[in-house]
């Protein structure tokens, strides 16, 4: 409350009785509440309120948007929690203005190849609802991406009127699932996969995901991943086994696709039988818990080299069976496995590859190795073999049959023990 003047008055009584009446009024100020693009507010507009009394305010994002905080644009009003869409504002001395801000919701952007009048399944995402821009001028709002009857396996579909390649944008909140492999039928077999060609962007929160095993396996349509697709779940995923296994047209992946996957233990068959043109240097950066790399890059004819330091952060790695089998690589980087001091299993690691140059220190510090059978089997162009039979360097090796089978062009082939050939 406030008074119009001083609260202390001097009144000469002059020997007479006097009666005084004091008047008071509420101290009010105006609060203007505005909404930025992408949402609405309550209350809205300009209203008068008593000072020092909290006023409830609420911001509601439109479909495809999310709340991005309150800002004071005029006056001395204070907001209890500027980051919450439902909070209180308190006026003090001045008329004030506040604004609710919104931002475009998280997005998943990818391209699809479509045939005219053919149903095209969308990728599986949970939670929602979502806004889907199909790239052909049609936009669907409040899309529920759960297939009827399959509460665990969502899905959505679209029909294009003409043949072509379309860029699809899905906007929405956090997801409870993430897969382009389609929905599951009653026999738990995946059906109706999304024919995604390139995945361009993902900022949808999939932090709930802990397994990416088989997530894209067998997707013949997939050609490239050009974004940090798993950024929001990288600290939670424990396995990536078979993730892109037999994606026979996948030729390009984001550099650092698995960077920071510090809980993931298994990358076996991750890129087996794909069309990768190269292995990005940061693919396994920060993968400190990785244990298995069995057949990770096997049977990829386009790979011609292995980046130096590829496994430098994989200090707990143990298994490298057939990791680079059937590759057209000509050389192996120095000290490729030197940081993998716990590694024990190198069966068929470079089997039937075209490698010619292998440095003697490729297995440096790997004193725990137990199995090197078929490690260089049928590497018929190799010019020199790492001396794994040196027991002072590798005292734990117990299995070594066919280690150097058909490697008779190696300059030190004659020094290889007969049981290793």
Predicted regions and their residues:
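Surface-exposed interfaces of beta-sheet-rich extracellular modules
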Residues: 1-8, 53-84
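Conserved "repeat-terminator" motif of extracellular CCP/Sushi domains
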Residues: 6-31, 82-106, 216, 244, ...
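Extracellular modular ligand-binding repeats in secreted and cell-surface proteins
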Residues: 13-16, 42-68, 91-94
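A short, solvent-exposed beta-strand micro-motif common in secreted/extracellular proteins
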Residues: 22, 54-62, 166-172
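N-terminal capping/linker segments that flank leucine-rich repeat
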Residues: 29, 101-214, 218-219, 229-234, ...
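Short, solvent-exposed loop/edge segments of extracellular or virion-exposed proteins
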Residues: 32-48, 113-115
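Acidic, Ser/Thr
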Residues: 36, 57-63, 123-125
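Core hydrophobic positions of leucine-rich repeats
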Residues: 176-187, 210-220, 226-230, 238-249, ...
């Amino acid at each position: 409350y406030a008074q119009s003047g001083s609260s202390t008055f001097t009144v000469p009584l002059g020997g007479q009785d006097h009666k005084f009446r004091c008047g008071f009024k509420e101290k009010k100020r105006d609060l203007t509440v505005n909404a930025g693009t992408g949402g609405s507010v309550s209350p809205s507009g300009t209203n008068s309120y008593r000072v020092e009394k909290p006023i409830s305010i609420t911001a509601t994002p439109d479909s495809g948007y999310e709340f991005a905080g309150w800002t004071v644009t005029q006056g001395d009003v204070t907001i209890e929690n500027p980051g919450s869409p439902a909070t209180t504002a308190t006026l003090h001395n001045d008329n004030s203005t506040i604004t609710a801000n919104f931002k475009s919701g998280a997005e998943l952007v990818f391209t699809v190849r479509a045939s005219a009048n053919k149903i095209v399944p969308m990728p599986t995402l949970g939670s929602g609802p979502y806004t889907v821009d199909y790239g052909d001028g049609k936009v669907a709002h409040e899309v529920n991406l759960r297939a009827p009857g399959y509460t665990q396996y969502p899905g959505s579909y679209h029909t294009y009127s003409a043949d072509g390649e379309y860029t699809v944008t899905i906007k929405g909140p956090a997801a409870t699932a993430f897969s382009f492999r389609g929905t599951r039928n009653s026999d738990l077999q995946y059906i109706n996969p999304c024919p995604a060609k390139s995945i361009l962007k993902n900022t949808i929160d999939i932090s709930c995901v802990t397994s990416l095993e088989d997530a894209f396996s067998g997707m013949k349509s997939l050609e490239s991943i050009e974004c940090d697709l798993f950024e929001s779940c990288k600290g939670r995923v424990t396995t990536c086994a078979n993730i892109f296994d037999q994606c026979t047209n996948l030729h390009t992946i984001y550099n650092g696709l698995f960077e920071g996957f510090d809980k993931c233990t298994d990358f076996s068959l991750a890129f087996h039988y794909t069309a990768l043109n190269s292995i990005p240097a940061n693919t396994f950066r920060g993968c400190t818990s990785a244990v298995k790399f069995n057949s990770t890059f096997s049977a990829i004819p386009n790979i011609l080299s292995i980046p130096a330091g590829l496994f430098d952060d994989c200090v707990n790695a143990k298994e490298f069976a057939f990791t680079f089998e059937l590759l057209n690589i000509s050389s192996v980087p120095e000290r490729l496995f030197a940081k993998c001091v716990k590694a024990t299993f190198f069966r068929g690691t470079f089997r039937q590859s075209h490698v010619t140059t292998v440095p003697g220190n490729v297995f440096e510090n790997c004193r725990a190795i137990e199995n090197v059978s078929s490690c260089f089997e049928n590497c018929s162009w190799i010019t020199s073999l790492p001396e794994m039979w040196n027991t002072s360097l590798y005292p734990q090796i117990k299995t070594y049959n066919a280690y150097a089978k058909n490697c008779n062009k190696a300059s030190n082939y004659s020094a290889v023990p007969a049981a290793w050939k």
